[in-house]
């Protein structure tokens, strides 16, 4: 039986992170202010999460919401935030910088990738702002990043599945392609079947705590995603070389 795909869950609070782990999440993307797509979590949130969670944690490195081109001062801030993530034992970092022309800023991203070593690096959904995603894939590979989080250039992942499949084929094991952007229990099976990716990302619509202040609904949503991935792993043929990544963090 094929091993099930990895599930990464994005969260903005310690309580949500703990609920995600209880639900079976394999990896946590730690952010704050997910309403703007996520920004760098505070040092205190990193410390608290690391103290309570054994699963891999990737910290968002994003000084603000909005466009993905940054001033020199913001770039320096990102460097400091990467150092903070390393000193607080994060397993990876998540960032993405574009030029004013809307291309991958290879030099700036490569500098941050080098600074982040030995942490894994995810190039986030700034990738979906690119005009040519296949050219962008080659540019991100040139930066030394580990994986790309993408919805295939569409607002919703289910509308970008054909493009994600092309990216997986072109990457051919050189880069982990991480589908995300609106993944829910209702559409995950289709995303899995049409992409056969080895990892998937969801925030479950950033479900809020219930009236008792708990994250039971969030935990149950994560568990539903895990169960779907387990079911799909029993139904799918072994992954092709284009989908094998050999990396699980």
Which residues are covered by each model-predicted region?
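Hydrophobic faces of well-ordered beta-strands that scaffold small-molecule active sites
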Residues: 5-9, 28-30, 57-61, 93-95, ...
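Active-site-adjacent beta->alpha loops and helix N-cap segments on the catalytic face
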Residues: 15, 34-55, 73-76, 97-117, ...
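Active-site mouth loops of central-metabolism enzymes
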Residues: 2-12, 61-79, 98, 122-133
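Short, low-complexity, charge-dense intrinsically disordered segments
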Residues: 237-249
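Ordered, amphipathic secondary-structure segments that act as subunit-interaction surfaces
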Residues: 80-97, 104
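N-terminal pre-domain/capping segments
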Residues: 2-28, 33-40
């Amino acid at each position: 039986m094929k091993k099930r795909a990895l599930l990464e869950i994005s969260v903005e609070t310690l309580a949500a992170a703990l609920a995600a782990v209880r639900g079976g999440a394999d990896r946590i993307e730690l952010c704050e202010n997910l309403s703007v797509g996520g920004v760098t979590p505070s040092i205190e949130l990193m410390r608290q999460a690391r103290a309570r969670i054994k699963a891999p944690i990737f910290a968002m490195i994003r000084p603000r919401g909005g466009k993905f081109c940054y001033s020199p001062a913001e770039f320096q801030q990102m460097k400091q935030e990467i150092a903070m993530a390393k000193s607080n034992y994060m397993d990876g970092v998540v960032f993405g910088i574009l030029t004013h022309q809307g291309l991958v800023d290879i030099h700036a991203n490569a500098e941050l990738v080098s600074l982040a070593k030995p942490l894994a690096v995810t190039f986030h959904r700034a990738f979906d702002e690119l005009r040519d995603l296949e050219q962008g894939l080659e540019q991100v590979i040139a930066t030394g990043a580990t994986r790309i989080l993408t919805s295939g250039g569409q607002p919703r992942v289910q509308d970008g599945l054909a493009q994600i499949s092309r990216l997986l084929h072109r990457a051919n094991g050189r880069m982990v392609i991480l589908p995300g952007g609106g993944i829910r229990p209702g559409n995950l099976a289709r995303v899995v079947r049409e992409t056969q990716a080895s990892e998937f990302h969801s925030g479950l619509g950033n479900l809020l705590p219930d009236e008792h202040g708990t994250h039971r609904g969030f935990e149950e949503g994560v568990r539903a995603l895990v169960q779907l991935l387990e079911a799909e792993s029993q139904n799918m043929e072994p992954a092709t070389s284009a989908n094998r990544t050999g990396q699980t963090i």
